[in-house]
C-alpha cells in the first residue's frame, strides 16, 4: 500500500500548480489551481478576496496580458510562478 501513496502524490503535484498573485502594493496571495483550469477562476477569487472589481484590474504573466480563458498549461506556467496585477488606468481630463 505504501507504494501507491507516492504515485498519487506525484500525480497530484503534476495536476496542480501553486501560483502567486502579486499586487502593486506589494501584497502576495497564493493560489493552488489545476493546470487545465481557466485562470478566470483564480482571477475572480483574487478579486473577491481583495475586494476589487475584475473590471478595475489587469493580470499579466511575463509581461503579457492574461485572458480569462487561458490556463496555466497554455501559458507554460510552472510551480511558484508569479502573476502580476495592475490597476486599470483610467483616462483623465484636462
From Swiss-Prot:
CDD domains: Ubl_SUMO2_3_4 (cd16115). Polymeric chains can be formed through Lys-11 cross-linking. Cleavage of precursor form by a sentrin-specific protease is necessary for function. One of its GO terms (cellular component) is nucleus. One of its GO terms (biological process) is chordate embryonic development. There is a cross-link at residue 92 (Glycyl lysine isopeptide (Gly-Lys) (interchain with K-? in acceptor proteins)). Residues 93-94 form a propeptide. Pfam families: Rad60-SLD. SUPFAM superfamilies: Ubiquitin-like (SSF54236). One of its GO terms (molecular function) is ubiquitin-like protein ligase binding. PANTHER family: SMALL UBIQUITIN-RELATED MODIFIER. Interacts with sae2 and ube2i. Covalently attached to a number of proteins. This is Small ubiquitin-related modifier 3-like. It comes from Danio rerio.
Amino acid at each position: 500500500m505504501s507504494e501507491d501513496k507516492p504515485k498519487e502524490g506525484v500525480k497530484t503535484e503534476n495536476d496542480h500548480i501553486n501560483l502567486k498573485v502579486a499586487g502593486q502594493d506589494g501584497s502576495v496571495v497564493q493560489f493552488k489551481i489545476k493546470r487545465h483550469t481557466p485562470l478566470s477562476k483564480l482571477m475572480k477569487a483574487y478579486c473577491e478576496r481583495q475586494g476589487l472589481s475584475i473590471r478595475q484590474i489587469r493580470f499579466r504573466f511575463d509581461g503579457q496580458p492574461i485572458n480569462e480563458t487561458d490556463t496555466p498549461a497554455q501559458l507554460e506556467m510552472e510551480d511558484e510562478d508569479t502573476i502580476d496585477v495592475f490597476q486599470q488606468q483610467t483616462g483623465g481630463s484636462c
